[in-house]
Amino acid sequence: MAKSDVKGVNLGMGTGRRKSSVARVYIREGKGDIKINHKNFDVYMQLEKLKTIALSPLALTHTLGKYDIYINVYGGGISGQAGAIRHGIARALFDLDEEYKMVLKSNGFLTRDSRKVERKKFGKKKARKSFQFSKR
């Protein structure tokens, strides 16, 4: 359930994960400031596709610009971090207000994407690719 911060404003928290990235998201009512690792959102996420992925839970719930969001993200690359931020924002929105549960759940934002890189096997070139086979 959502907690209150020092000023008495509702504070939602959520942890999102994707590949090897982890994002801790803190949401509170505000004017729409988004900070990732103490940097502005537009400075940290420069690709438009990744911005769309990261902010999709806010766009879906029509809450873009209503909340101040503070994100601490580490691990992985920018694509995995964008997915982790999306998962974390969805969980934080759900923590803040449970009315969003049906919308977020039906679009798969509350579900952890469990796909990870498959490990390389010995006797193979990569995870599944084999060395060239010669019959003779």
UniProtKB/Swiss-Prot annotation:
Superkingdom of this protein's organism: Bacteria
Database matches in InterPro entries: Ribosomal_Su5_D2-typ_SF, Ribosomal_uS9, Ribosomal_uS9_bac/plastid, Ribosomal_uS9_CS, Ribsml_uS5_D2-typ_fold_subgr
Protein name as it appears in the record: Small ribosomal subunit protein uS9
Organism: Borrelia duttonii (strain Ly)
NCBIfam families the UniProt entry points to: PRK00132.1
Disulfide bonding pattern of the chain: none
One GO cellular component term noted in the UniProt record for this chain: cytosolic small ribosomal subunit
Record keywords: Ribonucleoprotein, Ribosomal protein
Database matches in PROSITE patterns: RIBOSOMAL_S9
Keyword Ribonucleoprotein belongs to the record: yes
A Gene Ontology BP annotation from the UniProt entry: translation
Entry's family note: Belongs to the universal ribosomal protein uS9 family.
PANTHER family reported for this sequence: RIBOSOMAL PROTEIN S9 (PTHR21569), SMALL RIBOSOMAL SUBUNIT PROTEIN US9M (PTHR21569:SF1)
GO molecular function, one term: structural constituent of ribosome
